[in-house]
From Swiss-Prot:
The keyword Membrane applies. It catalyses: 3-hydroxyhispidin + O2 = (E)-caffeoylpyruvate + hnu + CO2; 3-hydroxyhispidin + O2 = 4-[(E)-2-(3,4-dihydroxyphenyl)ethenyl]-1,7-dihydroxy-2,3,5-trioxabicyclo[2.2.2]oct-7-en-6-one. Disulfide bonds: none annotated. Coiled coil: none annotated. GO terms for cellular component: membrane. The keyword Cell division does not apply. GO terms for molecular function: oxidoreductase activity. Belongs to the fungal luciferase family. Keywords: Membrane, Oxidoreductase, Transmembrane, Transmembrane helix. This is Luciferase. It is a single-pass membrane protein.
Amino acid sequence: MSFIDSMKLDFVGHLFGIRNRGLATACCAVAVASAIAFPYIRRDYQTFLSGGPSYAPQNIKGYLIVCVLALFRQEQKGLAIYDRLPEKRRWLPDLPPRNGPRPITTSHIIQRQRNQAPDSKFALEELKATVIPRVQARHTDLTHLSLSKFEFHAEAIFLLPSVPIDDPKNVPSHDTVRRTKREIAHMHDYHDFTLHLALAAQDGKEVVAKGWGQRHPLAGPGVPGPPTEWTFIYAPRNEEELAVVEMIIEASIGYMTNDPAGTVIV
């Protein structure tokens, strides 16, 4: 150790009343590491805030929550996981590939899209507060609208409380409906116009493979989060993409209500 380094440690020890040279070294190392990490933490916190309202409050407490949950993050675009799930039916036809590369998404558990935003005029006229109610209106016998239990700020489609979920004749014989608390789909139309919804395994595989979405970062077996079937859908940018997204929402409703129409055994 150089004379200057020794003087620095003596100064740290004197400043904080620390007489143990090893403890002073540790305190100095922590201070340096904190100074290096602070700019990254500040940028990361701003990224968290830019994700908009969610289940985590937009403050330091919410940021710490998502940082802890990030320890359980799963990969989101692999396809093999779907073939290990018991549901082999499909409610979606073959989808066209989505144009262009996938959008950049947030690195946080609060899943949002960071680029490829829809045009503001299209978003306001065709997406905001219209897509979810319009699709749900076709299924009022089995679904209703309520505030999302995942996002707290989004209107969501739910399976009606009157539909029993313990009878496999009414809902699929797995725990997806139970784990989502009957929630089927919601759109973040207060922020980036992306969606979260539940899809049958083979429909989820089709959506991810064709570039229309990816799994939630906490979705997967053995993870304290939503079921594997919980899927993030990228924001539609035009009428053609909106038609595909509405088709995906319809498939989500079909799966969660166990609608026999249009199913295909694969």
